């Protein structure tokens, strides 16, 4: 699945939300999150993000890896 990382914090542009064909992207208090159970890995969200915050999980930069777990926890705690 795809993961939204730190550049989204405070930005929350929502272009990704409108683009996602399966409504897997949800708004959190500080950023958007991608539901890993709904994400179909279509990558539609990645190029529309104006702050380049979206990565395929295996390509999340090393200094952003914490967002993989943060993303999972967002949906685990819902």
UniProtKB/Swiss-Prot annotation:
InterPro entries (UniProt xref): 4Fe4S_Fe-S-bd, 4Fe4S_Fe_S_CS, 7Fe_ferredoxin, RnfB_subfamily
Entry binding sites for [3Fe-4S] cluster: 8, 16, 49
Main function: Ferredoxins are iron-sulfur proteins that transfer electrons in a wide variety of metabolic reactions.
Organism: Alicyclobacillus acidocaldarius subsp. acidocaldarius
Residue ranges occupied by any 4Fe-4S ferredoxin-type domain in the UniProt entry: 2-29, 30-59
Record-linked PANTHER family: FERREDOXIN, OXIDOREDUCTASE
Gene3D superfamilies: 3.30.70.20
SUPFAM superfamilies: 4Fe-4S ferredoxins
Name recorded for this polypeptide: Ferredoxin
CC cofactor: [3Fe-4S] cluster; [4Fe-4S] cluster
Keywords assigned: 3Fe-4S, 4Fe-4S, Electron transport, Iron, Iron-sulfur, Metal-binding, Repeat, Transport
Domain of life (superkingdom): Bacteria
Cofactor binding summary note: Binds 1 [3Fe-4S] cluster. Binds 1 [4Fe-4S] cluster.
One MF annotation (Gene Ontology) recorded for this entry: 3 iron, 4 sulfur cluster binding
Chain sites annotated for binding [4Fe-4S] cluster: 20, 39, 42, 45
